[in-house]
Structures are given as C-alpha cells and as structure tokens.
C-alpha cells in the first residue's frame, strides 16, 4: 500500500485536482481511500456527489467521544468504489484544526480501515504546515507528497514552505517529495516557471493541468470531470496525471529555496517587478495621493 498526500495553498484547486486524479487511479483498478485533512471538508464531495461529508470530529462531538463511533459512521464509498473519510476541524477560532487529522487517522488505523488498499490519499491544507497539518508527514503516514501549485506568487511561496516541512521530517519519517502538479492559472510562461521551481526544489513538475471550464461544469454537479464527461480532453489530463503518479519512482528529499531566491525567480519571469520598479511605482502612488490631497484642500 502506498500512502500519498496532496498539499497546496487554499484556493489552488488542490481538492479538485486530487479527486479527479484519484478517480482516474481508481478506474485503473486501484483500491483507494481518501482521508480529507482540510477543515473545509471538501476533499471527498466530488467522489460522493454530495455537499460535504459529515466529519469524524463532528460525529465524535455529537456522540461524546471518537471511541463511540463505528467505522461505517464515518467511512462512505463513492465513485469507482473509492472510500472516503473527512477528519474535519473545530469551530473557527477555537482549538487546533490539525487535531481532527490526528484523531481521524488514529481512529481509522484502530478500526482496520487501511487493510486491502492500494493507495491512501491525504488531502491537506498547505498555507501553513503547523504541527497538526504536518501530521501525515511527521508521523510517516504519507510517504509521497504531491504539491499542487501554479505560476502565481503565493502558490509558489506555499509550495516552497511545504518543501521546507518535508525536508524537516525527511530523515526521521522517511517522507519524500513526489513532484509539483501545476494547476494552471494561465500565467505567462507558467510551464517554464514551475519546471524551474521544481528543479530548484530537487523535484519534477509531474504534470501540467491546463485550465478548463469543464472542471467548473463538473463541480457544479458535484462530480469529477472523469465521471461527468469521461470523453472530454480534460478527463484525459487527469488520467495522464493518475498514470504518472502510479508509475512515479522519482521520490526526492527537497531543497527549499530562500525567499530572496524565490523573488528573483519571479522577477526573471516578469511576474514581479524589480526593487527599482517597486520604488518607482510607490513614489508615483505617493505623488498621486499628495496631488489628490492638495486638490481637495484647495476646493
């Protein structure tokens, strides 16, 4: 059994990408379980064709304790017989969101949910790699990490941060980076940019997923593209990514870069102005504001 994880910043399309990819892997005959580790609990809805799955933490709070739950209470089966669990999180502003991940994984292990599987996939929020969110990495649960990113600055910043988290536990937990998945935002020279970032991080861009309205069309119906429109070219993109992950042997210890190097990369690809350009823009802004203030005073 291989344990993989999809990490990425919020809003990058991580859950959509992972569910479409896992649907392709399941169609190839793999027995799969998804463990959603995002407080939004949206890691399984396209597989289950539902709004949001009831989470382990929510049910545990209702029943009194996680020990009062049965496996069938939290584990549902969806498209292509993919098993689905959502760990959930606490009320906003209260407690640690990562606690749900730890609680859910421990419960699933104790209940034998990991038996007879080819892949377990963790779908994890990656804006911050705090102790709870890093749990699949830290405890060696996830052996292969796939980072969903794009050519946008904050997505790349998050990818580099996640690489730092992987490096921290690579020697103790045995976790490795499987590659970057570029979920395209139609940024100029996006393929080249992510390939260079991957090279700097000592990994590969395992696949470039083009932007397509078909993804949103399928999402409106709470389906993956593979289920909603199996003959569409976008479905083939996810099948290709699925095959690449199944056959991937390039698992590496990442080499994160510092923020200055990342900024330099963005400047080289024209996505960020140089320090001189930044100063000019700021000076122009200040001059405009001063002129506006002077005009309003004269009135």
From Swiss-Prot:
Q: Name one Pfam family in it.
A: Fer4_NifH
InterPro entries per UniProt: NifH/chlL_CS, NifH/frxC, Nitrogenase_Fe_NifH, P-loop_NTPase
UniProt-recorded name of the protein: Nitrogenase iron protein
> What's a GO biological-process term for it?
nitrogen fixation
Identify the gene encoding this protein: nifH
> Do you know which Gene3D superfamilies this protein is assigned to?
P-loop containing nucleotide triphosphate hydrolases (3.40.50.300)
| Residues reported in the UniProt entry to bind [4Fe-4S] cluster | 96, 130
Copy out the cofactor comment: Binds 1 [4Fe-4S] cluster per dimer.
Report residues binding ATP: 8-15
User: What family does the entry list?
Assistant: Belongs to the NifH/BchL/ChlL family.
Residues modified as ADP-ribosylarginine:
99
Assembly, in brief, is: Homodimer.
Maturation and modification:
The reversible ADP-ribosylation of Arg-99 inactivates the nitrogenase reductase and regulates nitrogenase activity.
Q: Which organism is it from?
A: Gloeothece citriformis (strain PCC 7424)
Keyword Metal-binding listed? The answer is yes
According to its UniProt record, the EC number is 1.18.6.1
């Amino acid at each position: 059994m291989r344990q993989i994880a999809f990490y990425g910043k919020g809003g990058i399309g991580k859950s959509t990408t992972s569910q479409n990819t896992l649907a392709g892997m399941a169609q190839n005959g793999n027995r799969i379980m998804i463990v959603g580790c995002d407080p939004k609990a949206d890691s399984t809805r396209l597989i289950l064709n539902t709004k949001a799955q009831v989470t382990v933490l929510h049910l545990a709070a209702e029943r009194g304790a996680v020990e009062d739950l049965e496996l069938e209470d939290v584990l549902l089966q969806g498209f292509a017989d993919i098993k689905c669990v959502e760990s959930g999180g606490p009320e906003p502003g209260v407690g640690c969101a990562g606690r749900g991940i730890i609680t859910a994984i421990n419960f699933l292990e104790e209940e034998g949910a990991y038996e007879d599987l080819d892949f377990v996939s963790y779908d994890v929020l990656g804006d911050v790699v705090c102790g709870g969110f890093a749990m699949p990495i830290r405890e060696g649960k996830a052996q292969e990490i796939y980072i969903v990113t794009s050519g946008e600055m904050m997505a790349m910043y998050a990818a580099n941060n996640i690489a730092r988290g992987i490096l921290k536990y690579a020697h103790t937990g045995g976790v490795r980076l499987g590659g970057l998945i570029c979920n395209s935002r139609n940024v100029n020279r996006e393929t080249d940019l992510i390939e260079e970032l991957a090279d700097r991080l000592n990994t590969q861009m395992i696949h470039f997923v083009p932007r397509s309205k078909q993804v949103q069309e399928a999402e409106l119906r709470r389906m993956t593209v593979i289920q909603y429109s199996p003959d569409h070219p976008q479905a083939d993109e996810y099948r290709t990514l699925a095959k690449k992950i199944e056959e991937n042997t390039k698992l590496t210890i990442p080499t994160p870069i510092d923020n200055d190097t990342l900024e330099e990369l963005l400047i080289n690809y024209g996505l960020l102005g140089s320090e001189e350009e930044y100063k000019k823009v700021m000076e122009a802004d200040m001059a405009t504001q001063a002129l506006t203030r002077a005009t309003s005073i004269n009135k």
